[in-house]
């Protein structure tokens, strides 16, 4: 814990640029790296994977009967940030319930935890623009390419 800095300021000031990886046109931060950085600064930080009860016992995903999503949270210094994320395939499209595997759910949990960590500040900029409609994303990518050429 750094004096006079909020959790957000402390984590947001960590340069993660050399740890950012890309896959299928999207940038991401490894969950292991993100969690390691959080624990270095805040050893008492905790995460939670939400579960729901079934007749067979608790399971770690939620469903509407068609697709599935996971819910996780990260708590640092008493502040909990919750993140929900669809269970997706390698193209980042929702997986239908009949095709869902435990591997898919586990990957979604780790990605969700990384996004919950980002809400606390670490690598938050990585997710800027991910909520833009596809047309706006394409325009933004064109502008970024043009700026890189200049």
Name each model-derived stretch.
Residues 1-150:
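Polyanion-binding surfaces on beta-sheet-dominated domains and ring/shell assemblies
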